[in-house]
């Protein structure tokens, strides 16, 4: 006689933990985000997470297939938080810009989590909602599907790549980050014009600029490219 398949919800813990809370995916992800902030990715283990939640570590596997599955859920949560803060206006450029900045900001709010999750594809509902939204904006702007997919990839990869890059800097110790930032004054600004004329000429500008993320600038460049493609398509249509 075949074994009865137990529904997923029935496998999950309904009794309160030692901390007096009833576990859920959301609660576990929130605890994981706190743990990443305090201990970094090396400190995120099932044992430590279980202890923080007042539950046996094995209980976590009722909710997630493993720590890799949890990492995907963390990325999904960060995606969802960005979408929750975003409001559509109907202007494709404004909507893409604010959504891109919201995604970047959501990941930077949790640098250790961003380093862990920015490169992952979760396939979870909130990530899917973000992807559907981006494609909807691009197609709604008038791009044909091949161009919409091309710019979708450029848009989401740009947001996540800069999220990972900028989060990596924020995840450094304060001492290491300060040393890196001071390098523009302590080293670059002192290079002689005889050997490094271009750096010497722009050293002060570099020192001021390199303390900021390039993401907004590059995002605007991408949006300019989308606008140019839409304009070219419109011109061809009127010929």
Please state what every model-predicted region is.
Residues 1-52, 65-72:
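Basic, helix-initiating cap at the start of DNA-binding domains
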Residues 1-23, 195-208, 234-239:
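N-terminal intrinsically disordered/low-complexity leader segments
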Residues 26-34, 38-39, 69-85, 94-102, ...:
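Alpha-helical structural segments
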Residues 54-64:
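Short hydrophobic/aromatic patch on the recognition helix
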Residues 75, 104-126, 132-133, 164-171, ...:
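Amphipathic alpha-helical segments used for helix-helix packing
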Residues 84-126, 145-148, 152-155:
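Hydrophobic alpha-helical connector segments
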Residues 130-185, 207-208, 226-230:
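Hydrophobic alpha-helical bundle segments that form small-molecule/ligand-binding pockets
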């Amino acid at each position: 006689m075949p074994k009865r398949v137990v529904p997923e919800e029935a496998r999950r813990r309904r009794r309160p933990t030692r901390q007096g809370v009833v576990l859920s995916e959301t609660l576990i992800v929130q605890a994981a985000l706190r743990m990443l902030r305090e201990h970094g990715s090396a400190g995120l283990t099932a044992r430590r997470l279980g202890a923080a939640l007042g539950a046996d570590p094995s209980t976590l596997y009722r909710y997630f297939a493993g720590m890799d599955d949890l990492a995907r859920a963390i990325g999904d949560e960060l995606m969802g938080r960005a979408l929750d803060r975003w409001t559509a206006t109907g202007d494709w450029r404004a909507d893409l810009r604010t959504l891109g900045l919201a995604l970047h900001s959501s990941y930077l709010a949790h640098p250790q989590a961003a380093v862990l999750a920015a490169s992952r594809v979760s396939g979870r509902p909130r990530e899917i909602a973000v992807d559907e939204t981006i494609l909807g904006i691009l197609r709604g702007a008038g791009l044909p599907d091949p161009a919409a997919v091309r710019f979708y990839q450029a848009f989401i990869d740009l947001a996540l790549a800069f999220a990972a890059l900028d989060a990596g800097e924020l995840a450094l110790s304060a001492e290491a980050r300060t040393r890196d930032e001071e390098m523009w004054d302590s080293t670059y600004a002192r290079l002689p014009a005889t050997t490094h004329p271009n750096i010497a000429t722009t050293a002060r500008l570099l020192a001021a600029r390199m303390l900021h993320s390039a993401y907004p600038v590059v995002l605007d460049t991408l949006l300019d490219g989308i606008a140019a493609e839409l304009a070219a398509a419109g011109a061809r249509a009127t010929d």
